[in-house]
Amino acid sequence: MKIILSRFVLGTALSIAPFASTQAQCVADLNLNAMVDYDDLLILLANYGQSCETEIWHDPIISEIHYNPSTQQGADTEYEFVELMNPFPFDIHVGGWQLADGIACVFPENTWIEAEGFLLTANDTAVLAPLLPEFVPLLPWTLSSGLHNSGESLRLVRPNGTEADHVIYSDAGTWPQDADGAGGSLEWKGSGYDNSFSTSWAGSNALGGSPGTPNSTWTD
């Protein structure tokens, strides 16, 4: 009986072994080849020290660019601005973020944009400050920044160096001509429009644009 039982047990173990091996999961099998081998060690070493936390960003949007104010309004250096909009129904923290390429502007710590509100960056904050509603942050450009009238690249960069938004505007092609020295600013049309495309922008209806307030051309 012992021999028969041993054969039965052994046979049963052998018969279920293939099934069991296909169902087993090895945490250390990083390359998923059903065994823990040297390649798994190389993968581990290549990623040693990396954080396993996933960063979740709530990105504001480049929503208005006033790159060529009209002579009626005043000098370019006084009235140029770039606006960001918070599309979320809650306040977002943007301390440590920055605008780069065409202009340089680093956002100080404890900088917040109110829910569905705005942040303005400009060369001459003293001139633009009286035009803004209360609680709209106004940050100065650095390094003698200024917007080119013929076109510019504007990048919004997160604190970790990744790109949150990127607009390359122009005064040519299908870009709105109303924003090129005719008095209006370049306004993003709103949600549903990809702001990397020229057709997602329009010249503002108001002289000098709509800094710190909903865009005059919003279609939603």
Region spans (language model):
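Positively charged n-region of N-terminal signal peptides that target proteins for export
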Residues: M1-R7
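Bacterial N-terminal signal peptides
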Residues: R7-P18
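Boundary at the C-terminal end of the N-terminal hydrophobic targeting segment
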Residues: T22-A24
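Disulfide-bonded cysteine-rich modules in secreted/extracellular proteins
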Residues: C26-N33, I62, D220
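Alpha-helical segments with a strong preference for the paired helices of cellulosomal dockerin domains
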Residues: L30-C52
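Activation on beta-sandwich/Ig-like modules and their edge loops
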Residues: E53-S198, S204-S210, W218-D220
